[in-house]
Amino acid sequence: MNDLISRAERFARVRHEGQFRKGKAQEPYTIHLEEVAALVERWSGSERAIAAAWLHDTVEDCPPTSLAELETLFSKEVADIVAELTDDKAQPKASRKEQQIINAPKKSNEASLVKLADKTSNIGAIANSPPHGWSLERRLEYIAWANTVVGNLPFLPAEGISEFLRRCDQAELNAYDDLGTVRQAQNASLRILERRAKRLGSSESQIRKFMLGFLEGAL
């Protein structure tokens, strides 16, 4: 492993020690960081981007970590990526979420890649281990918000956006399966099948034929 990346990993593991994800599984927070870094690497991210993936929540969630400290330890370039990914915790949560939408188009390519990986990991967690007590509406609102943020990013590798959308589909389907009615779950399945067919380039007539066959139990 590259020295920069291994140092960033060690630093993040120490700073995030004792933190857990919000999902029912209560996984150590470092599981999220591992996945984000792995996705950035898989999508051909630079060494700086992979290091930033490990560090992206340290300033926000691990006081007294600062951008100045990250610059000293890991370089200005890495610290700048982390700065692009750090919310202002002094702002209300609703404002921070709105700022993520507004600021997404301004992200550098490296920050865009880490943000995409971060949202992909979070959506996967919503699909498989959602936070305790989240209603159907809250899950769907999060999925829609994450889609808006990602849709505004200026750099989206094809493999990355494909994985993100696949997890969004699964998160929506699981939400309806867990908390919706049978009819809602069926309708969600149809919407997801239609979206996937469109992403694969199927024509309107092909999609119509497929959906009719599905509804008639021909598949």
Across the structure, where does each feature detected by a protein language model lie?
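Active-site helical microenvironments for divalent-metal-assisted chemistry
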Residues: M1-L219
